[in-house]
From Swiss-Prot:
The TXY motif contains the threonine and tyrosine residues whose phosphorylation activates the MAP kinases. Dually phosphorylated on Thr-174 and Tyr-176, which activates the enzyme. Phosphorylated during osmotic stress. It comes from Torulaspora delbrueckii (Yeast). A motif (TXY) lies at residues 174-176. The gene is HOG1. It catalyses: L-seryl-[protein] + ATP = O-phospho-L-seryl-[protein] + ADP + H(+); L-threonyl-[protein] + ATP = O-phospho-L-threonyl-[protein] + ADP + H(+). Signal peptide: none annotated. Activated by tyrosine and threonine phosphorylation. GO terms for cellular component: cytoplasm; nucleus. The modification Phosphothreonine is found at residue 174. This is Mitogen-activated protein kinase HOG1. Residues 380-409 are annotated as: Disordered. ATP binds at residues 29-37, 52. Residues 23-302 form the Protein kinase domain.
Length: 427
């Protein structure tokens, strides 16, 4: 079993990184709302990696569920154009670390340094659509596709990352999720009832930005964003307006003066016709008339790279049964531990649940394991209490400490199996 001594602590931007000695040379490369990302060297594989620390994943049930979702997606989605999970571990402080390939830069940074030549625009768009074809075939929507979520290495290999916002293809989806410039109009117009087509819109915006070197729809706010979209596409058609669910949004849209669309060939005069044709098929107001990733791959513009024998789909749909679950933190904790153990092919531990079982069965097993841990903690705390001298303040302090330690030992005993792999796999 891994001990605290098997992990090395270091401060990065005031944040404690607690990793095994397999990983060295930590340098910060990015900071998100829920985690810090560092580059590092994997001394076992002899290659650079990115390590994302999920801070306090078990502090709330919402954060625990979000982390569980991201882990499940990273385990399920395995494709050349998606960032792939190489390692995952739980530190003694119960932070979770995801280890993935390290790409040299992202598309956002690349676009700020120089304009892209035609062949790079083609190749990057091809890889984006190739990745989306796979993601969508798995029943997953990225929802936050933007240049900073598209990673590129020195060989121009492209990988889509950050599936933290990814969701099921669900007929009733709500909320603002994607960065405004790349947000599909159906998200702005309805805030629900959207599908995989939102990713195609985002990819179209990225395509235009790669072509022109600047964002196509740089909206200052929600209203301005919609306005500059209609500057190009014209007013939304009636069948799109009829899908608007928000009464206020409907009043706003119908109050606007009618606008005629600008022909794409006039707006993009310096762009080759085949590129303009594909872009026009991606940026369509009606999501049901928007081209799919699979169809876009066979478009003549991408002919130099299209290979129907090497554009795979997912082996199975992603299981979203957990998505509506409202579970306590300790249940999510046990399920997370089991996923980590499963990733490292470690089995046979006490209470370990079968990650291939139905979600309901997993929840039942995880709930039982968490309840058992709590019962053990309570029994051990009571035993300490009975054997202590209640009149001694030092004993009272010892008793409280023993109870805390007992509870911690009980609930983390299950999870220590997840830490255990450090001995077997990281040396």
């Amino acid at each position: 079993m891994a001990t605290h001594e098997e992990f090395i602590r270091t401060q990065v931007f005031g944040t404690v990184f607690e990793i095994t000695n397999r990983y060295t040379d930590l340098n910060p490369v990015g900071m998100g709302a829920f985690g810090l990302v560092c580059s590092a060297t994997d001394t076992l594989a002899q290659q650079p990696v990115a390590i994302k620390k999920i801070m306090k994943p078990f502090s709330t049930a919402v954060l625990a569920k979000r982390t569980y979702r991201e882990l499940k997606l990273l385990k399920h989605l395995r494709h050349e154009n998606l960032i792939c999970l190489q390692d995952i571990f739980l530190s003694p402080l119960e932070d979770i670390y995801f280890v993935t390939e390290l790409q040299g830069t992202d598309l956002h940074r690349l676009l700020q340094t120089r304009p892209l030549e035609k062949q790079f625009v083609q190749y990057f768009l091809y890889q984006i659509l190739r990745g989306l074809k796979y993601v969508h075939s798995a029943g997953v929507i990225h929802r936050d596709l933007k240049p900073s979520n598209i990673l590129i290495n020195e060989n121009c290999d492209l990988k889509i990352c950050d599936f933290g916002l990814a969701r099921i293809q669900d007929p009733q989806m709500t909320g603002y999720v994607s960065t405004r410039y790349y947000r599909a109009p159906e998200i702005m117009l309805t805030w629900q009832k959207y599908d995989v087509e939102v990713d195609i819109w985002s990819a179209g915006c990225i395509f235009a930005e790669m072509t022109e070197g600047k964002p196509l729809f740089p909206g200052k706010d929600h209203v301005h964003q919609f306005s500059i979209i209609t500057d190009l596409l014209g007013s939304p058609p009636e069948d799109v307006i009829n899908t608007i669910c928000s009464e206020n949004t409907l009043k706003f849209v119908t109050s606007l003066p009618h606008r005629d669309p600008v022909p794409f060939r006039e707006r993009f005069k310096t762009v080759e016709p085949e590129a303009v044709d594909l872009l026009e098929k991606m940026l369509v107001f009606d999501p049901k008339k928007r081209i799919t990733a699979a169809d876009a791959l066979v478009h003549p513009y991408l002919a130099p790279y299209h290979d129907p024998t090497d554009e795979p789909v997912a082996d199975a749909k992603f299981d979203w049964n957990f998505n509506d679950a409202d579970l306590p933190v300790d249940t999510w904790r046990v399920m997370m531990y089991s996923e980590i153990l499963d990733f490292h092919k470690i089995g046979g531990g006490d209470g370990q649940i079968d990650t291939s079982a139905t979600f309901d069965d997993q929840v039942a097993a995880a709930t039982a394991a968490a309840a058992h841990a709590a019962a053990v903690a309570q029994a051990q705390a009571q035993a300490h209490s009975n054997s202590s001298n209640s009149n001694s303040s030092s004993n009272v302090n010892s008793k409280s400490k023993a109870a805390r330690d007992s509870a911690n030992d009980a609930i983390t005993n299950y999870g220590n199996q997840a830490v255990h792999y450090a001995n077997e796999f990281q040396q």
